[in-house]
Amino acid sequence: MKITFKYITLSLLAGASLLTSCEDFLDREPLDSVTPDTYLKNESQLAAYAINAYSFNIHSGYNGGPIVSDNGTDNQATASPNTTYWEPGQWRVGTYDAWGFGTIRNLNYFLEIVIPRWEAGEIEGVEKNIKQYIGEIYFLRAWEYFSKLQNLGDFPILTKVLSDKKEDLIEASKRRPRNEVARFILSDLDKAAELMTNSPVGGKNRLTRNAALLVKSRVALSEATWLKYHRGTGRVPGDDTWPGKQKDYLKDFTINVNQEIDFFLTEAMAAAKEVGDQITLTVNSKEVNPTSSASGWNPFFEMYNSKNLEDLSEVVFWKAYDKALSVNHNATYYTSRGGGNYGFTKGYVKTFLMENGLPWYASNSQYQGDDHIYKEFQNRDYRLRLFSASELDRLQMKQEPVESDPTTWNVPKILELPEGRNVTGYHIRKAMSYEIAQGSGGDTHFLSDYGCVVFRGVEAMLNYMEACYEKNSNLDATAESYWKAIRTRAGVDPDFNKTIAATDYTKEDDWAIYSAGQPVDKTLYKSVVNVDVSSLQMACECGI
């Protein structure tokens, strides 16, 4: 009996021990996943969270890269017409769900967790780097909100992670007037600019102060001109037919649109000038084809196809690639084969000035006609001659050094399979490399690993010019200096007044002469014509 009792006692003790051990095990943090209490507590974790949230238009997939963003516009066409935009009665609600909050929630979560820890001194790491990564999150929230502003206008302003209670979600879904959303974006960009530097770990492959200021100028200019040119349409807060007027929660909302326009233009000028005054435009050697080597012949052309863009002053933010890490892209594969299934439109090509600064239709312009593309390009702005190609321009490389009998574009490849098709006859070679190792002349996908420009400093100069003229109805000394520098780089006479004097709207096919259906001032048109602030600014600066 004693023996039995002894075994029972030992069994109970062993069981108690196992239960205690089990409870201790269950109290442990999971070893295969990250938990809120253990993450976002040091510099490297902040860096990883921030860069994982990067979402920019870069080279990727089976296409020519960011250049395809201009497809379906008046500047660039693809084989499938964009009837949704341009044919009367065909406008449809997009399939893209712009009313989404996933990204905003993730960014708010970071700020909600990290800011208190940072202020309490609980984040491990170098203070400069900690501030950098917090600044990046503010930038990214502004970037996401700018997308919402462009797609939806009025939008809820959320700064905290919401509960899943229905009442809370309904309250948080109330849209704020678009000018308030724009001010919120500028506020986030101000915080980003204050926290970030222009020399972070990772260089300009990470966001910087200049990137924040550049985007701030873009957002502010966009909102100012939206308010100015769409006033009275019902799409501007305060309009009689503005939907917000019907909302009880906005019954006390007031706005002085003129003051708002002035505020945004002032902010755009200040932000743009800080960046514009710092940068040096990349040199244009005026060589339009490689002569002795696939590289080193024109820095301006090679700004879009070099492995390392870090030392280029004009490049504010860029994406690096590396074959050794299997981080490649397809840009040269498509552009060097003859088309990529897109091309510049005739209307866009017409906007490029002659070297003497005159429009093509002006007397004494030295325009050679358009019987052949190479004649149409003669005596033209070097941006057209460099980033498009005529029949006589080099198509691709087959060997190094440069062969004496090069492969040229010859006739436009308008009947090829889509990946090699030139849709309009005006072939685009921006962001194309002539290096064989990058895919020139080859039949293999994903050989390219040169960098991709995301933000260029020249945009700041353009934004300043436009904001200055919109605000003051004239150009100040800074705006004039920017304009002359851009024209000089393009090989165009820097005297912009002769261009303005020769401009005849009855001979212009460019949609950019209109805003909200009304012709704009000729100085404004010629200073910002066809400015495209997509990541590569493919259609940028053509007629200035």
For each feature predicted by the language model, list its residue ranges.
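Bacterial N-terminal signal peptides that target proteins for export
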Residues: 1-9
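Bacterial N-terminal signal peptides
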Residues: 9-17
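C-terminal motif of bacterial Sec signal peptides marking the signal peptidase cleavage site
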Residues: 19-21
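An aromatic- and glycine-enriched ligand-binding surface/loop that stacks and positions planar moieties
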Residues: 23-83, 155, 159, 190-191, ...
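Conserved, well-structured interaction surfaces
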Residues: 35, 41-61, 78-152, 168-209, ...
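Acidic/serine-rich, low-complexity amphipathic helices located in mid- to C-terminal regulatory regions
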Residues: 146-150, 297-325, 522, 526-544
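Active/binding-pocket-proximal capping segment
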Residues: 402, 458-464, 474-513
